[in-house]
Amino acid sequence: MSLKMMERLSTDMDGTRDVASPPARQDAAEPERTVELSGVKEGAAPNSPPRAVPVIELLRRGEGLGNIKAREQELRLQNIRTTELCRATLTPATELCRAPLTPTTELCRAPLTPTTELCRAPLTPTTELCRPPLTPAAEFCRASLTPASELCRAPSSVTGPSLTATTELCRPPIPLPTPSTGPPAEQAVEARMVQLSPTASLPLQAAGRTMLYGLNQPLASDNSGYFGDPDTFPMYTSNSRAKRRPGPIEVEISEGPQPKVVRRIFTNSRERWRQQNVNGAFAELRKLIPTHPPDKKLSKNEILRLAMKYINFLAKLLDDQEEEGNQRNKGNKDNGMVQQELLQDMLSPNSSCGSSLDGAPSPDSYSEEHDALDSKHSRNLHQAMLPIDGSGQR
């Protein structure tokens, strides 16, 4: 009877029973037997699963079929408690998701590459913020844009439109004729190599040149007082203002946003040439003033003062010469009239009985009187020149 019950229990519990441990000794104490029934040994961990008791041991202890089935159900419940929350095996990195995930994708269930932690679509390293993939060469050759529109541009390939040279920030880029033949990369390089040159700049207009200098008015002429014959005096001519000669360097001005700079350059150049003309006129005037050392250094103030004194002296000298000529003519007329009267008196029949030449003056007396007049005039002229000589020796 006992053998049949053992065979029936063994066929019912083939899939669920564990490997039996060696049987305990029958002469063990009663506390040991109660511990074996509960499946926990002394010193074992409290959370460790209880050891399975073999069916033969249960039959030996005299337990019935109902007790064996209850024991079996208890073992199944204990095995279910050992699995924590998920039935599938999970890796330590995927503690919140039941599907197996790679360690780099802790927040998303779809497998992603390590470089794309925020976006699921695969991106290249150059497109960091979810842009369409671009090649490294297309990062600088996109489209002809101004320097202000450097951000937020649409992607373009290398074979796009050639770039224009943005060499001038004040004006829009100038369209340059590019040859139709040749690869597009060479055309882009040629357009990038454009420098600031007269051919690349805007054409010069006549208004810019006339703003600095007159086109038909030189700053000086060949027949001016400074460059002309020293015998002529330009200050007495009708055109007293000296003409200007052209400067050594003419600055060509194109259209630009700097009118103040252009006006300052023009003013400085005009003042420089005016000062040169004034200095040249003073140098010519200094040559005309007689001084005791001929090469004496004089300031502009001294040159002007000596020139005024010299002009006054020359004017007075001309007046004296004119007065002297008038006196000579008057004296000659008076002497002729006196001689005629004397001759008439001498030749007249009513003359005195004495000698005819007693009362008539001799020719020597007329020469002595003329010499006295000449000496008096020379003394007056010498006195007029004395102040000029004293001032010239300073």
Swiss-Prot record:
GO terms for biological process: erythrocyte differentiation; hemopoiesis; regulation of transcription by RNA polymerase II. Residues 1-17, 367-377 have a biased composition (Basic and acidic residues). First expressed in patches on the ventral side of the embryo in a region that will give rise to hematopoietic tissue. By late neurula stages, expressed throughout the ventral blood island region. By tailbud stages, expression extends to probable vascular progenitor cells, but is excluded from the presumptive liver anlage. Also expressed in the central nervous system at the tailbud stage. Residues 1-49, 347-394 are annotated as: Disordered. Keywords: Developmental protein, Differentiation, DNA-binding, Nucleus, Repeat, Transcription, Transcription regulation. Induction: By bmp-signaling in the ventral mesoderm. Inhibition by fgf regulates the timing of hematopoiesis. Sequence repeats lie at residues 83-89, 94-100, 105-111, 116-122, 127-133, 149-155, 167-173. One of its GO terms (molecular function) is protein dimerization activity. One of its GO terms (cellular component) is nucleus. It is found in: Nucleus. It holds the Pfam family HLH. Coiled coil: none annotated. InterPro entries: bHLH_dom, HLH_DNA-bd_sf, TAL-like. SUPFAM superfamilies: HLH, helix-loop-helix DNA-binding domain. Its main location: nucleus. Residues 83-173 are annotated as: 7 X 7 AA approximate repeats of [TS]-E-L-C-R-[AP]-P. Residues 262-314 form the bHLH domain. Transcription factor that acts synergistically with lmo2 and gata1 to specify embryonic dorsal mesoderm to a hematopoietic fate. This is T-cell acute lymphocytic leukemia protein 1. It comes from Xenopus laevis (African clawed frog). The lineage of its organism: Eukaryota, Metazoa, Chordata, Craniata, Vertebrata.
